[in-house]
C-alpha cells in the first residue's frame, strides 16, 4: 500500500511538471505570430531570429508571470482553506483580492496624478495593505459566524464593497489612468516585463520556501488545534504566519496581474484528488505546480480563442474553476446528509 502511494505521488508530480513544460512551450510558440521550437532553441543559443523581440520581450515574461503567479494563487488558496478549515476559501472568494485591488487602485491614481512612477515594490506594498485590511474584516466576521456559507457570503460582501470603492476611484481618474486601471482591474498577464518577473519571483520564492518549512506544523494543525498544541505547535504564531503569508501571495498576484478568480479555490481540490493525499509536504509544491498549469492553460485560451481580441484571464478561469467549486459544495452537502 505504501509503495503504491509513493508511485502515485511520483506519477502526479511528473504529470504536473511535464504539463508545465508543455504549456510553457505552447504559450511561447502559439499566438498571432507563430514561433517554432527550432527558432526558440536557436535564440537561446545566441542566434538572431526574426521574432526575437516578440519572444523575449513579450511572450517569455508573460509566460513566466503566468507560471509564477498561477502557482502563488493556488498556494494562497490552500493556505486560506487550511486556516479557515473551509474548502471554498480563497483570495477572490473571501474578498482579499478585492481589498488588495482597492488600495492598489488608490495608490496608482494618487501617484500617477502626481506624475510619480509606480514601482513594482510600491504596488505590492499597497496591495498587501489592502489584503490585510480585507483579511482583518474576514477574521472579524469568522468570529461572529460559525456557518461556512455565511463566512463565504461575508467575504463576497466585503469584495463587493471594495470593488465599489475601486469603481468610484476609476470614475474620477483621468483618461490615461483609466486605461491602465481598467486593464489591470480586469485581470491579465499582458504587459509583463522582466523587471516585474524578477520582483515577483524573489517575493514568491521566499514566501514559498517559508511555507514549505511550515509543512509539519500545518499537518498537525489540520488534525485539530488541540492535537497541534499537544505536538508543540504555537497556534497563535502559526495563524499569524498563515494570514501574513497568504496576504503577501495575494498582494503580489493583484499587484502584477489584478484579481484572478477561482484559481485559489479550485486548484487545491483538483491537486488533492490527483495526489489522493492532503499532506502539506505534498500539497504545497503540488498546489504551486497545479496553479501554474491552470493559469498557463487559461492564459493560452484567453490570448488565442478570439484572437486578436483578448479575454480577461478571470473570464477563462471562472469557466473552468466555478464548476469545481460547485462540485466541492455538492460533495460536502452529500457528506453531511450521509
Q: Which residues make up each language-model segment?
A:
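Alpha-helical transmembrane segments in inner-membrane proteins
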Residues: 1-338
Amino acid at each position: 500500500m505504501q509503495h503504491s502511494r509513493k508511485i502515485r505521488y511520483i506519477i502526479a508530480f511528473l504529470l504536473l511538471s511535464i504539463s508545465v513544460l508543455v504549456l510553457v512551450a505552447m504559450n511561447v510558440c502559439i499566438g498571432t505570430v507563430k514561433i517554432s521550437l527550432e527558432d526558440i532553441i536557436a535564440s537561446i543559443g545566441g542566434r538572431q531570429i526574426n521574432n526575437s523581440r516578440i519572444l523575449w520581450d513579450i511572450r517569455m515574461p508573460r509566460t513566466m508571470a503566468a507560471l509564477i503567479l498561477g502557482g502563488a494563487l493556488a498556494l494562497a488558496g490552500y493556505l486560506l482553506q487550511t486556516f479557515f478549515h473551509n474548502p471554498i476559501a480563497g483570495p477572490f472568494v473571501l474578498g482579499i483580492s478585492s481589498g488588495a485591488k482597492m488600495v492598489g487602485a488608490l495608490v496608482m491614481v494618487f501617484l500617477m496624478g502626481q506624475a510619480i512612477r509606480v514601482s513594482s515594490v510600491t504596488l505590492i506594498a499597497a496591495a498587501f495593505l489592502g489584503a490585510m485590511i480585507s483579511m482583518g474584516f474576514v477574521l472579524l466576521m469568522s468570529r461572529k459566524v460559525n456557518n461556512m456559507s455565511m463566512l463565504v457570503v461575508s467575504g463576497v460582501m466585503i469584495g463587493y464593497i471594495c470593488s465599489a470603492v475601486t469603481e468610484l476611484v476609476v470614475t474620477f481618474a483621468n483618461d490615461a489612468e483609466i486605461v491602465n486601471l481598467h486593464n489591470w482591474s480586469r485581470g491579465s498577464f499582458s504587459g509583463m516585463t522582466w523587471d516585474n518577473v524578477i520582483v515577483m519571483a524573489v517575493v514568491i520564492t521566499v514566501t514559498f520556501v517559508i511555507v514549505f518549512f511550515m509543512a509539519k506544523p500545518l499537518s498537525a494543525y489540520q488534525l485539530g488545534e488541540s492535537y497541534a498544541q499537544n505536538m508543540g505547535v504555537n497556534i497563535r504564531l502559526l495563524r499569524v504566519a498563515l494570514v501574513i503569508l497568504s496576504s503577501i501571495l495575494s498582494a503580489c498576484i493583484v499587484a502584477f496581474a489584478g484579481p484572478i478568480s477561482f484559481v485559489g479555490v479550485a486548484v487545491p481540490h483538483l491537486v488533492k484528488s490527483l495526489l489522493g493525499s492532503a499532506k502539506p509536504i505534498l500539497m504545497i509544491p503540488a498546489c504551486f505546480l497545479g496553479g501554474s498549469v491552470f493559469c498557463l492553460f487559461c492564459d493560452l485560451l484567453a490570448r488565442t480563442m478570439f484572437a486578436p481580441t483578448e479575454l480577461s484571464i478571470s473570464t477563462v478561469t471562472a469557466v473552468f474553476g466555478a464548476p469545481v467549486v460547485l462540485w466541492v459544495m455538492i460533495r460536502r452537502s452529500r457528506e453531511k446528509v450521509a
